[in-house]
Regions:
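Intrinsically disordered, low-complexity and often Lys/Arg-enriched segments
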Residues: 1-15, 252-258
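Charged, alpha-helix-enriched surfaces in structured cytosolic catalytic cores
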Residues: 8, 12, 20, 24, ...
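Interdomain "pre-motor" coupling segment immediately N-terminal to P-loop NTPase/helicase cores
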Residues: 14, 18-74
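AAA+ P-loop ATPase motor domain of ring mechanoenzymes
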Residues: 48-101, 105, 243-256
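Conserved P-loop
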Residues: 89-167, 216
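Walker B motif beta-strand of ABC-family P-loop ATPases
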Residues: 170
Length: 258
């Protein structure tokens, strides 16, 4: 076969791959074919590897897209969390949650503890694990969510915005109960929490014991209703009072001296 004929074939394959939106196939078919010859692979093994590369690239791009669409303030994975610096945390339980069973069962997860104890990191880590499982995820703070819902209500767009929040397979509400909110705002937040109860998962981080949530929602009846929805079948993980960030920094300094 002439060099010119081979060049035409390669160009045709690239065009076919482009038409079929098989970017990885178009970009790697030649190098993988050369590698297959070196490894003495058969045609089926080569084709399996080539299509496998396409599938893997699409999966990785999908994960990256879902992570971007989730609006994490910072990407933090559970693999990055130094459980050795927080031995009081139930590492096995958290890793089990990362497998995603709570998502299919629409169970809430609540991280409760002082500032700096790793709540946001672990919540983000679970959410990124969900992105890897092809779930639609959205991260927000309680204040951001309430502001968005209040603005939507003022613009007569509350139903549209609320429905969008219901479509996510997982939402993370960070910094719940950090600041008090007006009753009207608390009612809007309750709509989201109640609407997702037993339908879709939610992860919440808070620095307040449940007995003190009336500091955020002064209306005792509304506060109780919100807690009832959030804690029903919930995985409640207490992160304690000792700063994970401080201990991690301290251990790094000790390690550097060694």
């Amino acid at each position: 076969m002439s060099v010119a004929t081979v060049a035409v074939q390669q160009a045709t394959i690239r065009q076919y791959a482009k038409d079929l939106k098989l970017a990885t196939v178009g970009g790697q078919f030649l190098s993988m074919a050369e590698e297959a010859v070196k490894q003495k692979q058969g045609h089926l093994s080569y084709l399996e590897a080539l299509l496998g590369a396409e599938v893997e690239d699409r999966y990785q791009h999908g994960v990256a897209r879902r992570i971007t669409e989730a609006h994490f303030p910072k990407v933090k994975t559970l693999e990055d969390f130094a459980f050795c610096d927080a031995p009081h945390l139930p590492a096995a339980q958290i890793r089990n949650l990362a497998e995603g069973g709570y998502l299919s069962r629409s169970e809430p997860v609540i991280f409760l503890g002082e500032t700096g104890t790793g709540k946001t990191h672990m919540a983000t880590g679970l959410a990124i694990a969900a992105c890897r499982q092809r779930k639609r995820v959205r991260f927000t703070t309680a204040a951001q969510l309430v502001n968005e819902l209040t603005e939507a209500k003022n613009k007569s767009e509350l139903n549209r915005v609320t429905n969008r929040w219901m479509r996510y397979e997982l939402i993370v509400i960070d910094e719940m109960a950090y600041v008090a909110m007006p009753e009207a705002a608390a009612e809007l937040l309750f709509q989201i929490i109640a609407g997702r109860a037993e339908r879709a998962a939610v992860i919440v981080t808070t620095n307040l014991p449940f007995s003190e949530w009336t500091a955020m929602v002064p209306n005792a009846r509304l506060c109780k209703a919100m807690l009832d929805r959030l804690t029903d079948q919930a995985h409640i993980i207490e992160t304690g009072t000792e700063s994970y960030r401080f201990r991690r920094t301290l251990n790094k300094k000790k390690g550097g001296k060694g």
